From Swiss-Prot:
Protein name: Putative transport protein AHA_3492
Location of the RCK C-terminal domain: 191-276, 279-361
Transmembrane segments: 4-24, 29-49, 65-85, 95-115, 158-178, 371-391, 403-425, 439-459, 465-485, 493-513, 533-553
GO terms of biological process kind: potassium ion transport
Organism: Aeromonas hydrophila subsp. hydrophila (strain ATCC 7966 / DSM 30187 / BCRC 13018 / CCUG 14551 / JCM 1027 / KCTC 2358 / NCIMB 9240 / NCTC 8049)
Localization: Cell membrane
GO MF terms, alphabetically ordered: monoatomic cation transmembrane transporter activity
Keyword field: Cell membrane, Membrane, Repeat, Transmembrane, Transmembrane helix, Transport
Length: 553
């Protein structure tokens, strides 16, 4: 059997064993995708005993490519809501994340001083305890720059391997402990997040208004200031017994009934200008008007503004709502269309069919993955992650790495939506499949590599002490920040789980958190919100620790 065939066969065995272990549940809690790590340790241990060795280059490629797939698909998933989340809660989330990193550094420095732990060992344990591979690389590089002994990098690697498994388990344990201590109900937390995110009760509102203001009489719809604003849409007009679709040049008369769509505060402002709210129904039922939902799939309209399509004038159809990535938006004339946008159309059936032909509404396209943008995004992400950033006073350059680069690029591209005929939309099922494959590959290799020397390190020498140092570095910051964020920050539990996973740059923990409520994007959103800053801090922190502790030695 060739080296590549043997490597793939062994990793498949690791995945099967690990996923089986992950399905075991104790009191309703299981390892989930994290079981693959322990499947890898078990298989790696017995492979080491039998003298079986896999090709290092193949393993390294599979590990890194799996990680790239995982973080890229996470970025594509949360990108549309990432920047709005950053504006609304980014400061709070990143503040807690920075505190967690700072506490971890403080615990590591204290252990080094109190127990006289060698600097390479504590740096390796620190990197493993926070499950951050770039941190390990940065630490090894700074030790070489400082002139440490040649065996220092090996010591760091051993410390990393010993601390890494509990680094993952510690996050899962912290999530479980917080859930038990605060008696949290997952479904209630998910519903609360949806409400706060504006996806349920706080979504767009509708109101029927009777025109009572004589100053409005005779004005065209486009001449009424309150209706010309970007946050209110007039989708229906009833005059007497006739229900019609209003056009910008439609003249308003006293007694007209208008059906408006918008945010609650905007509708209240319009109500004060136009007249009074009425209970009269403006339903299209029994009339020649229809309300239909169509999906934007036509590549020709991607990136175009609604005003450029001139739908109101050409087809006498109003777009009353726009749903993008589960969030309802007011479809203004300045809104650019993206692939997968869901439009609410109001108009006559033949006119709606004409607009449908313009925007696409081909359901099969929603199940297809455009592969060219995927590899463009991954390639750009790898390039960004490889760019060195030089800071004054640091002997080594800083990089986002293969985990940070693809994530940042995916966030930006999914927010842009489309460029020409290229669109960064991925069906949820395809996104989930690629994400799960990526994290399984990554964990399988990490576990397999750690398995060979794992038991020996634990049983002989200082292995148990190193593991306890790792436990302290993992648990103390997580528990302190977790309790503070929940108790004083009043943070949603699913958001908190994403914060903890992101603060430890731990994809398996995010996969575990996502599994608690698969339909909620709360954990992934907070993970992506803190990840860029945390990755930067995780790369800097071992270098700062090395410089400070080396100087104090």
């Amino acid at each position: 059997m060739s080296d590549i065939a043997l490597s793939i066969s062994m990793l498949s065995l690791v995945a099967v064993l690990g996923l089986w272990l992950g399905n075991w549940r104790v009191y309703g809690v299981g390892l989930g995708i994290g079981g693959v790590l322990f499947g890898g340790i078990i298989v790696g241990h017995f492979a080491g005993l039998s003298g079986l060795a896999l090709d290092e280059q193949t393993l390294h490629f599979i590990q890194e490519f799996g990680l790239i797939l995982f973080v890229y698909t996470i970025g594509i998933q949360v990108g549309p809501g990432f920047f709005s989340s950053l504006r609304s809660s980014g400061l709070k989330l990143n503040g807690f994340a920075a505190l967690l990193v700072l506490l971890g550094c403080a615990v590591a420095a204290a252990l080094h001083q109190l127990f006289d732990v060698p600097l390479p060992v504590i740096l390796g344990v620190f990197s493993g305890a926070v499950t951050n591979t770039p941190s390990l690389g940065a630490g090894q590089q700074i030790l070489a720059e400082l002139g440490a002994a040649p065996g220092s990098t090996g010591l760091m690697g051993m410390g990393y391997a010993v601390a890494y498994p509990f680094g993952i388990c510690g996050i899962l344990l912290t999530m479980w402990l917080i859930r038990m201590f605060f008696r949290i109900k997952i479904d209630e937390e998910a519903a609360q997040f949806e409400q706060q995110a504006g996806k349920t009760k706080e979504s767009l509102q509708t109101i029927n208004i009777a025109v009572r203001n004589p100053n409005i009489h005779g004005l065209m719809l486009s001449e009424i200031p309150s209706l010309d604003e970007a946050d209110v849409i007039c989708s229906r007009l009833k005059r007497g017994d006739e229900l019609m679709v209003p056009r910008p040049d439609s003249r308003i008369e006293l007694g007209d009934l208008l059906h408006l769509v918008g945010e609650r505060h905007a509708l209240r402002k319009v109500l004060l200008v136009l007249g009074e709210e009425v209970e009269t129904s403006l339903s299209t039922r029994g009339t020649d008007l229809r309300v239909e939902r169509v999906v934007v799939t036509n590549e020709q309209v991607l990136g175009k503004k609604i005003r450029d399509l001139d739908i109101k004038q050409k087809y006498d159809v109003v777009i009353s709502r726009l749903n993008r990535a589960g969030i309802e938006l007011v479809p203004t004339s300045q809104t650019s269309l993206q692939f997968g946008d869901i439009l609410n159309l109001v108009g006559r059936l033949d006119a709606i069919e004409a607009v449908t032909n313009v925007v696409g509404n081909v359901q099969q396209k929603l199940q297809q993955v455009q592969m060219l943008p995927v590899f463009i995004g991954i390639g750009l992400g790898v390039l960004l992650g490889s760019i060195p950033f030089y800071l004054p006073g640091f002997p080594a350059a800083l990089k986002l790495g293969l985990a940070g680069g693809p994530l940042v690029v995916a966030l930006i591209l999914s927010r842009i939506g489309s460029i020409g005929k290229l669109y960064w939309f991925m069906p949820p099922s395809a996104n989930l499949a690629l994400r799960e494959i990526g994290i399984v590959l990554f964990l399988a290799v990490v576990g397999f590599k750690s398995g060979a020397g794992f038991i020996d390190t634990l049983i002989n020498g200082d292995g148990p002490a190193w593991m306890m140092y790792g436990v302290a570095i993992t648990l103390i910051p997580l528990l302190v920040v977790g309790v503070l964020a929940r108790l004083y920050g009043k943070m949603n539990y699913l958001t908190l789980c994403g914060l903890l996973a992101g603060s430890m740059t731990d994809p398996p923990a995010l996969a575990f958190a996502n599994g608690m409520h698969p339909t909620s994007g709360a954990s992934a959103l907070s993970y992506a919100t803190v990840y860029p800053l945390v990755m930067f801090l995780r790369i800097i922190s071992p270098q700062l620790l090395a410089i400070l502790l080396w100087a104090g030695a």
